[in-house]
Structure formats: C-alpha cells, structure tokens
C-alpha cells in the first residue's frame, strides 16, 4: 500500500503541474528514500499502471486522505516520532517538499507570466501555493463563514478553524526546545524551504516571489490561512519593525501599480491597534472587495492646496478618510500631511490624546487600491490609549463584547471581516441547545459569559425555533462585530463625533507651512 501511495502522490504532482513528466522517476526515488524503502513493490506498480488516471479535481480531493495514509505509515514504522498534529504537519510538509519545483523555477514562471499579465502571474502562484499544500485547502473548507447585514453594508464573519490547536506534548516539547533565532520570525525570507521544528512550522513547500517596491527588496507570498480570496502578505526583505510613515504610502501605491487587481494595506505600528506581528515590516492584500471598500462617502471634504484630490469621510463605523486621485504623488503628500497632523493631534473634549507620559497614541491603518483610472488611499485613524475602565484600550472592543471578540482590531477587521476564535463553533452549538431548551445560561461554566448578550437579543424575536435559531445566532454575532468596530472608531457615528472629526480636518488644513519646515529640518 505504501508503494501505491508513493506512486499516487507522484501522480498528484504531475496532474497539478508540480512535477514535470521528466521528473517522475526522480520524484519516486526521493519519496522511497524518505520512507526508508529500497524499491517499489511490483504488485503496486502493476496496480498503478492499470489505474484510470486521476483528474485534477480528483487529485485535489484525494490529497488529505493520501497524506494521512503516508503519515500513518511513517508513524507505524518509526519514521515519524510523534503522532500529533504538530509533528504530522512537520512531516507532511517534508513530503510535499519532495514534489516542489525549485524557487528559481517558480520565480522564472511567475515573471514570464507577469510580463504578459499581472493577474495571470498571481493566478499561477496562488494555485501553486494551494497545490503544494502550503495553503491546506481541506482545512480552509472547515472555516465557518457568513455575512451580516448592517447599515454600513454586509460585514464578513469567519470562525477560523484551519489553524490547528497545539497538543499538550508539542507545547511541552516547545518549552524544552533550544531557543533559535533562525528564522527570526514567521515572515522572514529564510522560512522558504526551512524544515521547521516543534515551535516553528515547516516550509519546504513554501515559495516566495521577489518584488521591488519603492526601489527596495520585498517579497510576495500568500497567507497559509487565507481569510479571504488570494489573501497575500507582502514583506520586507529585511527583518525591520513596522513603521507607518510617508514612505509607507509610497510603497502601498507602488505595489498597487504593479498588481492593480489587488488591494494592499498595512497594520498600524502601535500595540493594541496594530496586528500580531509588529517586529517585521509587512503589508496584507488580496483579490477581494471588503465592505469598507464598497462603503460610500458620507461627507465630501476639501483639503487646502489639494483641491485636485477627491476626499471625504467614509460611511463606516471606524474613522476613515478616503483620498482619490490619478496622481499617486499627490496622494502621498496629502496622506503624509494627515499622518503628521494626526500623530501630534490632541482634542481633550473628544478624548483624543497624542501622547500620555511620553507614550505616543495616534497612528493610522492605511489601505490602497486602484479604482478605474484613480488610485485610492483609505486612512483609518487609530488611537491606543488605555484607562482603568478600559485597560485593553478605549478604542478597542469593550469588555461587554469580549465574549465574542477581545483580540486586536487589525487591518482585516478594520476593513469589515471578523476573524473570530475557534471556540465559538462549539459555543454556538451549545447556545443553540440551551436557548431552545430554555436552560439557565448563568449556571453553565462555558456559556455564562454569553448570558447578558442572549438576554438582550431574545426579546427582539417573536418566535425562536429549530429552523431559525442558527440564523438568529449568526445575525447577532454579526451585530456584535458591528459594535466592535464602533468601539474601535475614534470618532463616533453621532453628531458630536462627526463635529469632532471635522475639527481634525480643519486642523490638517491649517498645518501647511509647519510641515514644510519640519521636513526641511529633518
């Protein structure tokens, strides 16, 4: 059976285009070596030769089961030392690495396609990243996804189930493992081809694409967890910290010029309002239109000296200034002016403080896209101040929402996609049963945190049944995410909040000469 599976995996490689026909024997021999075999079983060869060749669809569908059989064999024969998710993932990545073209071949193919069409190049690379099992299609399919209708548009909700939970043995082994500084982080270019270890994923099946952004060396890859279509990561070739500055806007727009079918954005560069990785400069993008991108302007505004740039406040729960123009240099200049003003801006009546005790609080989450002949920049104003009442952040999901979402509101959430914790899948199922049976949620250790929320929304519905309960729970989770975004907005969607927002716009318009002097002196 093992020999038959080695042949089937080789066929998978050829059907998907990972393995050229000329490399068939070579690939079989590499897999024999990996599984400590000296030859193919003759019966397996006969069975393989008499098979009906698999289609691409069959190849994709069969990969998980095929790898599981190979992993089981490896464990039963002492090749794989632990039979847990972490160790199985390390070994099946090694298996898939045997099928992969070398980095230079992938880059050459990408670049030759790019010369004709940028989309054709990313289509090839995205398919490769899935066929290689770097993006595990069969795990991504397990994610729960739905949309929630709000006055701000359709918000995307996802419960991420594709990121495996670490098992206790792996956690214990990771604590005992020698601490390594190689690669420095999960984004570094040194991950390409790396074998991994118990506390760092294997990446033998990973290929990255070099891109030049603003005359510096960057790389393109996809997220292995694809929260949305073609979820890509664009990262600096150097392990250098995140920083939002004038050059950031130039880099984002330069990337969009090269890949006009993609949007790209950056997480903010401060804790609480930033992403999970602040140590390595990177952007996230993809081929997807979020609710925020679809949102219209609530109010058009004019920036003095930039009358050629269309600008406005976006109808969105967070505080977003949208700039649009065909000339990217004009966008960069105005975005920089807004950023510099915001960095130093304090409005005590609106509870916005540029800094307290020397700690800066104001930053921006920027997003770039091409729309028709114009380039767009969405500048989301952020502030990470904390108080005794809100120790995790004033402009962060407040405590009453933590039963659904308490993690940072990063770039993806800002644009309208909730990435919710895996625990919610089971909790939703338990909530359904408890609500239908009228059970006491407060006496349930797992569900008690949801009790206030459920008691608040139940009266809205005349009748809750087996048929409509799932839809109701999903809808209400979506409305919680709406509240999360409203909490994260520095200017609230009220008359008072909008007046405060316009005070900031007025301040930007008064800053022209000051900023010219500041840059000249720097």
Question: What feature does the model see in each segment?
Answer:
Residues 205-208, 237-264:
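Helical scaffold of the NTase/Pol beta-like nucleotidyltransferase catalytic core
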Residues 247, 256-279, 285-339, 343-346:
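Catalytic or ion-translocation cores adjacent to nucleophile or general acid/base/metal-coordination motifs
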Residues 1-234, 238-241, 317, 331-335, ...:
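Active-site microenvironments that recognize anionic phosphate/pyrophosphate groups
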């Amino acid at each position: 059976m093992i020999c038959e599976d080695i042949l089937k995996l080789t066929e998978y490689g050829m059907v998907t285009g990972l393995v050229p026909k000329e490399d068939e024997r070579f690939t079989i021999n590499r897999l024999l070596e990996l599984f400590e075999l000296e030859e193919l079983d003759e019966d397996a060869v006969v069975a393989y030769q008499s098979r009906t060749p698999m289609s691409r669809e069959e190849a994709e569908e069969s990969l998980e089961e095929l790898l599981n059989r190979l992993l089981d064999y490896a464990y039963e024969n002492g090749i794989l030392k632990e039979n847990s998710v972490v160790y199985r993932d390390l070994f099946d990545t090694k298996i898939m690495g045997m099928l992969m073209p070398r980095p230079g071949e992938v880059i050459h193919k990408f670049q030759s396609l790019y010369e004709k069409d940028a989309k054709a190049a990313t289509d090839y690379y995205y398919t490769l990243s899935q066929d290689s099992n770097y993006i595990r299609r069969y795990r991504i399919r397990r994610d729960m996804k739905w949309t929630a209708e709000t006055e701000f548009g359709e918000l995307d909700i996802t419960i991420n189930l594709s990121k495996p939970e670490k098992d206790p043995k792996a956690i214990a082994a990771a604590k005992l493992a020698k601490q390594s500084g190689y690669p420095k982080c999960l984004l570094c270019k040194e991950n390409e081809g790396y074998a991994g270890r118990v506390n760092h994923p294997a990446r033998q099946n990973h290929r990255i694409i070099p891109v030049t952004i603003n005359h510096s060396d960057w790389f393109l890859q996809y997220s292995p967890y694809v929260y949305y279509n073609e979820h890509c990561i664009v990262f600096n070739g150097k392990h250098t910290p995140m920083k939002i500055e004038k050059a950031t806007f130039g880099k984002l727009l330069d990337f969009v010029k090269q890949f006009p079918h993609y949007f790209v954005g950056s997480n903010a560069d401060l804790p609480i309002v930033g992403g999970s990785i602040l140590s390595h400069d990177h952007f996230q993008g993809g081929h997807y239109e979020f609710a925020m991108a679809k949102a219209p302007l609530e109010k058009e505004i004019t920036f003095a000296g930039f009358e050629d740039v269309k600008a406005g406040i976006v109808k969105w729960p967070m505080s977003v200034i949208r700039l649009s123009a065909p000339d990217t240099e004009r966008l960069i200049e105005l975005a920089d002016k807004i950023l510099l003003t915001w960095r130093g801006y304090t409005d005590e009546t609106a509870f916005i403080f540029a800094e307290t005790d020397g700690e800066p609080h104001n930053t921006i989450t920027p997003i770039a896209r091409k729309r028709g002949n114009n380039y767009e920049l969405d500048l989301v104003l952020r502030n990470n101040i904390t108080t005794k009442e809100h120790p995790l952040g004033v402009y962060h999901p407040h405590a009453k929402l933590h039963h659904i979402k308490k993690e940072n509101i990063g770039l993806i959430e800002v644009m309208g996609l909730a990435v919710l914790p895996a625990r919610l899948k089971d909790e939703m199922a338990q909530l359904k049963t408890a609500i239908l049976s009228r059970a006491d949620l407060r006496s349930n250790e797992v569900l008690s945190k949801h009790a206030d929320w459920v008691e608040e929304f139940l009266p809205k519905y005349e009748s809750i049944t087996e048929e409509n309960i799932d839809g109701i729970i999903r809808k209400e989770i979506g409305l919680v995410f709406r509240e999360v975004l409203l909490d994260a907005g520095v200017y609230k969607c009220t008359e008072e909040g909008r007046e405060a927002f316009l005070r900031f716009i007025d301040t930007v318009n008064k800053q022209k000469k000051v900023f010219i002097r500041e840059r000249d002196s720097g």
